Amino acid sequence: MSNWSHKHILDLSSFSIEDYQTVVELANRFKTIPRSGSRKLPALQGRLIATLFFEPSTRTRSSFELAAKRLSADVQSFAPSNSSLIKGETPLDTVMTYVAMGAHVLVVRHGGTGVPEQLAKSLDQKKKNVSILNGGDGLHSHPSQGLLDLFTLTQFFNKESPSPRNIAGKRIAIVGDILHSRVARSNLWSLTACGANVVLCGPPSLLPDDFAKFVEAPPSGQKKDPIKNRGKVTISRCLKEALTDTDAVITLRLQKERMSENLLSNLDKYHNEYGITHESLKWCGKHVPVLHPGPVNRGIEMSSELLEDNSISLIENQVSNGIPIRMALLYLLSADKN
């Protein structure tokens, strides 16, 4: 906590290994609190957390709101359909309304890439002591999902002592619609920062050839990468090649709502070539976990049988881990605000 320096959490590109360690350790402390009584902590009593979701969400929004309530914060929820957006109000107008109401942290999800960052810059220019936490923006970033996936994997590899160090040297495959996935981008930052080597796998239409260079550029506004020994990123078009000797698999939803009709015409062919099943996991050569950020298209990204196999599928773990991870982020951003 003493070394935490982030006023906003917009993506994970500027996170140091110490930042990841801080978040994982704090989330683990929140997760291990005895599940008895009210299960609430007074840590953020008197703080106001507002969830401003300009784009639909079930898991992320519910998780953030439950996380805030478990820290005893007041929660205000924003729904575009019941707002003044239909009257011409801009996202900044909406944000400033909640700032005027005394909000300490604004969790913002928006379909436009870069909108949370623009809002954060506007608040800083106005010298407002209010934090923006990106709940997912366009194709850019979904930092809390990247962190909860990291936390879930650290638990799998060492349940007694979850730590980013647990994934150093591991080979992790990310399979599916990487082109349209803000989750993939956040996972690339977090996993490689902690020393994992990532292989990206998908058809050319969903995985550009130059995507492996994504983590090579310095983070926005910085001269150099804060990570000294970042893991490597490679691309494979062959699922068997990608899964061979892999230690964990993250499969991604086909975001059909973001695709043109001819981008991926045959879903059966996609499942046959890139779908994760019990049979395809044999290529890993060992027992490996499978993660998915949800919602899952059954029989496309992964088989229904695998989805329901809790000895392999960590999807339920991801959902439950989302709460302590988001508790940690809300605490780090708002605990020191007056």
Swiss-Prot record:
GO terms for cellular component: cytosol. Keywords: Pyrimidine biosynthesis, Transferase. L-aspartate binds at residues 87, 182, 253. Pathway: Pyrimidine metabolism; UMP biosynthesis via de novo pathway; (S)-dihydroorotate from bicarbonate: step 2/3. InterPro entries: Asp/Orn_carbamoyltranf_P-bd, Asp/Orn_carbamoylTrfase, Asp/Orn_carbamoylTrfase_sf, Asp_carbamoyltransf, Asp_carbamoyltransf_Asp/Orn-bd. GO terms for molecular function: amino acid binding; aspartate carbamoyltransferase activity. It comes from the Bacteria. It is an enzyme of class 2 (transferase). Carbamoyl phosphate binds at residues 59-60, 109, 142, 145, 294-295. GO terms for biological process: 'de novo' pyrimidine nucleobase biosynthetic process; 'de novo' UMP biosynthetic process; amino acid metabolic process. It catalyses: carbamoyl phosphate + L-aspartate = N-carbamoyl-L-aspartate + phosphate + H(+). Its EC number is 2.1.3.2. Pfam families: OTCace, OTCace_N. Catalyzes the condensation of carbamoyl phosphate and aspartate to form carbamoyl aspartate and inorganic phosphate, the committed step in the de novo pyrimidine nucleotide biosynthesis pathway. Heterododecamer (2C3:3R2) of six catalytic PyrB chains organized as two trimers (C3), and six regulatory PyrI chains organized as three dimers (R2). PANTHER family: ASPARTATE CARBAMOYLTRANSFERASE, ORNITHINE CARBAMOYLTRANSFERASE, MITOCHONDRIAL. Belongs to the aspartate/ornithine carbamoyltransferase superfamily. ATCase family. This is Aspartate carbamoyltransferase catalytic subunit. It comes from Prochlorococcus marinus (strain SARG / CCMP1375 / SS120).
